[in-house]
């Protein structure tokens, strides 16, 4: 069975992963068939680059992405695009849907960042209140 999975590269404490197509029996950093992308988890925001055409080819050939790679592919919108193609949509409809999807993802990202900053400020206020309350 062929898998699409991560292969670790980089150095100690600074991982960079290659998204590779490999036989399921080969070790994590062992022999692989093709490099189809990269993933940098230490970059802010996480950097994912993929070769969409090659991933589509390998998935149609029968390669199964691991759970982590599947979520990385999903963040790029490739799975949604493939689903639209399988539903028989035209290229114009697919491009319009993908634009809407990207806008929706940008809104979700902004909401997540706003919520994160709100929680951070609330935590700081609570700590400051506890510090001043503890002194009195």
Curated annotation (Swiss-Prot):
Regions that span the bilayer: none
Bias (Basic residues): 113-122
GO molecular function annotation: structural constituent of ribosome
Keywords attached to this entry: Ribonucleoprotein, Ribosomal protein
UniProt xrefs under InterPro entries: Ribosomal_bS16 (IPR000307), Ribosomal_bS16_CS (IPR020592), Ribosomal_bS16_dom_sf (IPR023803)
One Pfam short name: Ribosomal_S16
GO BP term, pick one: translation
Gene Ontology terms: cellular component: cytoplasm; small ribosomal subunit
Region (Disordered), start-end ranges: 113-136
Membership in a protein family: Belongs to the bacterial ribosomal protein bS16 family.
PANTHER family in UniProt: 30S RIBOSOMAL PROTEIN S16, SMALL RIBOSOMAL SUBUNIT PROTEIN BS16M
Protein name (Swiss-Prot/TrEMBL): Small ribosomal subunit protein bS16
